[in-house]
Design a protein with these regions (language model features):
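N-terminal amphipathic/basic leader segments beginning at the initiator methionine
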Residues: 1-54, 58
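Short coil/turn connectors at secondary-structure junctions
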Residues: 34-37, 59-60, 74-79, 112-116, ...
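Short beta-strand segments
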Residues: 41-42, 81-83, 119-121
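Short, ordered loop/turn segments at secondary-structure junctions
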Residues: 45, 68, 85-87, 122-124
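Short acidic, glycine/serine/threonine-rich loops at helix termini
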Residues: 53, 92-95, 128-133
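Glycine-rich oxoanion-binding loops at beta->alpha junctions
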Residues: 53-74
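Alpha-helical support elements that line or immediately flank enzyme active sites
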Residues: 81-110
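Glycine-rich, mobile lid/loop segments that gate access to catalytic sites or pores
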Residues: 100, 105-156
């Protein structure tokens, strides 16, 4: 089997990360592997966010909530919480409540309006987020926010 060539590479220096952004990535116990599975990106004030969203009728709750918040705020988004392990897709009202609870908790910890926080989830479809693990680890995640923490966020 041949290897595919790629031009992708990791950012290697703080100077190459987006100006004013902070990053964090930790292992929160969302995955059984003990690997990093929770990340947070904090954007500077007055940042503008845009999104490209699937047109599929099968969408995770976080996709719908992200799209609504970006439209409602004209793109004024400050934080993005990212989890891996559970996609939180096809989970009904439970998935919606988990997304809203997680973004509310992040907004409290960062002193932001809840509408300024987005959430992205990837992982096993049909499985709700391990919400207790996620919520319990948010204070540690926020403490890890640093401009030079891009790699930890990327690993999650």
């Amino acid at each position: 089997m041949s290897q595919i060539e790629t031009k992708w590479s990791f950012v290697s220096a703080v100077e190459e990360t987006p100006y004013g952004f902070s990053f964090a990535g930790i292992a929160a116990g969302l995955k059984d592997s003990k690997k990093k599975d929770l990340a947070l990106i904090l954007a500077p004030e007055n940042s503008i966010c845009s999104g490209l969203f699937t047109q599929s009728i099968v969408r995770a709750s976080c996709v719908d909530i992200c799209e609504q918040r970006i439209k409602k705020s004209s793109g004024r988004i400050r934080a993005i919480l990212i989890n891996s392990g559970q996609a939180n897709a096809c989970t009904g009202d439970v998935g919606i409540q988990h997304t809203l609870t997680a973004t509310r908790e992040v907004s409290k910890l960062l002193g932001l309006n809840e509408e300024e926080v987005l959430m992205c989830s990837t992982g096993v479809i049909g499985i709700p987020i391990k919400l207790k693990n996620l919520i319990d680890n948010l204070p540690n995640l926020v403490k890890e926010l640093k401009i030079n923490n891009f790699h930890n966020a990327a690993e999650a």
